[in-house]
UniProtKB/Swiss-Prot annotation:
Part of the 30S ribosomal subunit. Keywords: Ribonucleoprotein, Ribosomal protein. SUPFAM superfamilies: Ribosomal protein S10. SMART domains: Ribosomal_S10 (SM01403). Belongs to the universal ribosomal protein uS10 family. InterPro entries: Ribosomal_uS10, Ribosomal_uS10_CS, Ribosomal_uS10_dom, Ribosomal_uS10_dom_sf. GO terms for cellular component: ribonucleoprotein complex; ribosome. The gene is rpsJ. Involved in the binding of tRNA to the ribosomes. GO terms for molecular function: structural constituent of ribosome; tRNA binding. This is Small ribosomal subunit protein uS10. GO terms for biological process: translation.
Length: 103
């Protein structure tokens, strides 16, 4: 696969899980002889929700919740057939969303 690039975007709520999955991908790609660029940490998305505690009065009584979405980017430059095969067989954690694009 000459002059190709595989771009892998990872998303997860747990930063330890996403770092572990990224390390597995990088180690697998390097072991099969491909060049790796990354992992590049992308900005973390923070979603905040404010909920009223009391059902009727007391507008000042509220709870605030936050969900953080961590993202990483890994580029695999000039992958070999062995690299693609190893990445397809790689079993990642269930809490990690993986998007793969060829470029």
């Amino acid at each position: 696969m000459p002059n190709q690039r595989i771009r892998i975007r990872l998303k997860a709520f747990d930063h330890k899980l996403i770092d572990q999955s990224t390390a597995e991908i990088v180690e697998t790609a390097k072991r099969t002889g491909a060049q790796v660029s990354g992992p590049i940490p992308l900005p973390t998305r923070k979603e905040r929700y404010t909920v009223l505690i009391s059902p009727h009065v007391n507008k000042d009584a509220r709870d605030q919740y936050e969900i953080r979405t961590h993202k990483r980017l890994v580029d695999i430059i000039e992958p070999t057939d062995k690299t693609v095969d190893a990445l397809m067989r790689l079993d990642l954690a269930a809490g990690v969303d993986v998007q793969i694009s060829l470029g």
